[in-house]
């Protein structure tokens, strides 16, 4: 059962400054891993008026024109003119990337790949809930879909006066752990100065909000706040400085589950901040898909240079068909959560990451993708291919 009667989550669009930074960091990772799948990459990005700075540590045999790549990401998002305050073609790009510390490398690299140590200490959480078809909390799902629709309406020309920066927030009402209504919707979207607030609010309401949210959950008491401060002309990196890793709750479960604090974007799979969080989602989703619980949160933790997790914990919030201790036993039997095993299990050594950097890392649909000669599946941690084996092992 959910302990909440109301719960709120937020999301931001691909044009939000922090998300620009995330997408640049993951574009750098993808470009490198496409040439050198065993590269070590930790790329951080800062964007502000007229400048994009990339920094971090990379060890690789690949060569990438990083300045050109950064510009392309910014332009593709929609910042392609001084009229919108930021232009990828003319902004300054600074590259201060160095090499990975040999002290870290010696703790990760092993002669036997399966003995690869964790790239750092830390704790990671995974979560799943049966309240939506994608086994994610409803508030974050709806928030993502709103800003995703905003980008679609902007790029397609349906609402040509929209600009890239936007934020959404959705409050859901719960009864007995199930979503029964949406009590509040907030959507703030950057726009051209020519459009009136009346026209903007009417169009956003009809073509974004009502188009996206389930009609049966909207009711006469639902509050709508569309651009509640009025004009939102100045946005993106002009309005706010953007940094990689500043939207970790947007990236995960919207606050419904706990978070270990480590960001995802710009990190290769040897960094358990990312790969173990993906594995946690994979485990939790398969547990819920198997019918072992209606809700499941898993915590895993690691020590730097050590392969085996230092702990695995499970909480099913009283919804489990078997005990949490039994589920932990099943997880240990069915999933290998050593870093190298996670990379293999989820097939993570492919240029799949820029797509994760906007609209959530979880609750997405796996798709086949080809980059050069490399064909692979994205969002592999969303598969439920181990649900039946978990059911069988649990005797259900």
Swiss-Prot record:
Gene Ontology annotations of biological process type: one-carbon metabolic process; S-adenosylmethionine biosynthetic process
UniProt EC number: 2.5.1.6
InterPro entries found in the cross-reference section: ADOMET_SYNTHASE_CS, S-AdoMet_synt_C, S-AdoMet_synt_central, S-AdoMet_synt_N, S-AdoMet_synthetase, S-AdoMet_synthetase_sfam
Annotated PROSITE patterns: ADOMET_SYNTHASE_1, ADOMET_SYNTHASE_2
Span of the signal peptide: none
Pathway: Amino-acid biosynthesis; S-adenosyl-L-methionine biosynthesis; S-adenosyl-L-methionine from L-methionine: step 1/1
Keyword Nucleotide-binding attached: yes
Annotated Mg(2+) binding sites: 18
Cofactor descriptive note: Binds 2 divalent ions per subunit.
Cofactor requirement: Mg(2+); K(+)
Residue numbers binding K(+): 44
Subcellular location per the Swiss-Prot or TrEMBL entry: Cytoplasm
NCBIfam families according to UniProt: metK (TIGR01034)
Function description: Catalyzes the formation of S-adenosylmethionine (AdoMet) from methionine and ATP. The overall synthetic reaction is composed of two sequential steps, AdoMet formation and the subsequent tripolyphosphate hydrolysis which occurs prior to release of AdoMet from the enzyme.
Family (UniProt): Belongs to the AdoMet synthase family.
Protein's UniProt name: S-adenosylmethionine synthase
The species this protein was found in: Pseudomonas putida (strain ATCC 47054 / DSM 6125 / CFBP 8728 / NCIMB 11950 / KT2440)
Organism taxonomic ancestry: Bacteria, Pseudomonadati, Pseudomonadota, Gammaproteobacteria, Pseudomonadales
